[in-house]
Amino acid sequence: MPIQQLPLMKGVGKDFRNADYIDYLPVNMLATPKEILNSSGYLRSFPGIAKRSDVNGVSRGVEYNMAQSAVYRVCGGKLYKGESEVGDVAGSGRVSMAHGRTSQAVGVNGQLVEYRYDGTVKTVSNWPADSGFTQYELGSVRDITRLRGRYAWSKDGTDSWFITDLEDESHPDRYSAQYRAESQPDGIIGIGTWRDFIVCFGSSTIEYFSLTGATTVGAALYVAQPSLMVQKGIAGTYCKTPFADSYAFISNPATGAPSVYIIGSGQVSPIASASIEKILRSYTADELADGVMESLRFDAHELLIIHLPRHVLVYDASSSTNGPQWCALKTGLYDDVYRAIDFIYEGNQITCGDKLESVTGKLQFDISSQYDKQQEHLLFTPLFKADNARVFDLEVESSTGVAQYADRLFLSATTDGINYGREQMIEQNEPFVYDKRVLWKRVGRIRKNVGFKLRVITKSPVTLSGCQIRIE
């Protein structure tokens, strides 16, 4: 009687709307490529969230400030250094952040506001008219960054970007402050730095600018590097993030159906699977523009997290050697969007903001709950052929014993890849029982095809691997 191994890293089913085959992504579970008990890897629940502190509002942005060796976070109408307030921030939308030796800058409400470490607050503006220096049409700030000794910001709705003065950061450079990304006539959507380049992200191109080294008064300090230009654009200001020594971004619909790419040496590499592109395609251009991307690293996982209005998707570079490995995160027992955002390593823990409440949290690896609420974890197997066969002993390896009370695993089967039947409850965790078997002894007769879904609702961490069945 043959025993068949079933992979859990990615299930396969059908879309009932168009009968296409789709991937069923793991939900709240991360794949770990490590040889465990005849399996090439195992799946581990995403770390839970515990409350850390009350703050002024929902999270709007975060940055690690190297000059102060502290995390600066904008929550509601306040700027926080660690857990202490250091300033007021106007507005309620997402903000851009950068920092230098003397100040922490926040791009908010069309202004570049500098919160100096001596307690004063300055807003970037033109030099006094009687100074004799050039007066610029600064317009509205869209995105900010910093390279070497200067802040740089993009002017909303134009292809212009500016740099601050070396001596006084609250004014533009006195001689050569304004530059243009001329391949982006519809405007610079976002700006960033990579190595020693200023990177301007448009809707159809990504341009790089490098220092010229000029010291002559009035000479251009930055010049475009056309050899590094990329013929893709980004969907929104925050649809980009440094990742894997480069940038990852969601492409703009102006260059075709949106996807997720990583930039490398003047060209882009797609990392999205067909199912991820289907999800991105379900959003309008305006909805995609509201997306936020961030990167996170822990326990050898290199994660790219994409926050969309109705989905939170996670790409794991460390598990993607045999093809892109994605999973989904969610909050609650239904399809509510994942609530945590703005992850950053702080002290010896990973802290995060919140999309729903005025709190900050911290990731805990010994739980899978979110603010003491149980979470649902889903895994799927691919459809496989078992023509007129009897199936016994569906077994999953589970690392057990750490639960506070007996947890159950819900198993259900599908024969068409769309509808899953009645769930079978199996105890899968129990306090101090470290070798508990998760076994469904009699599955039944299969007419043609079959696939399985595993569902766990718990506060405890979940570790599953090695799904197998016996076929007669």
Predicted features and spans:
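Short beta-strand segments and strand-loop junctions that repeat across beta-rich extracellular domains
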Residues: 113-117, 154-172, 206, 312-320, ...
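Beta-sheet repeat architectures centered on beta-propellers
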Residues: 1-102, 231-246, 253-472
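Acidic surface patches and DE-rich sequence motifs
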Residues: 65, 116, 155-156, 202, ...
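Beta-propeller and closely related beta-pinwheel folds
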Residues: 48-58, 84-93, 122-292
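Generic structural signal marking isolated hydrophobic packing positions
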Residues: 104-105, 151, 206, 394
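Residues that form or flank phosphate/diphosphate-binding pockets in enzymes
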Residues: 107, 201, 389
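Hydrophobic or amphipathic alpha-helical targeting/insertion segments
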Residues: 98-131
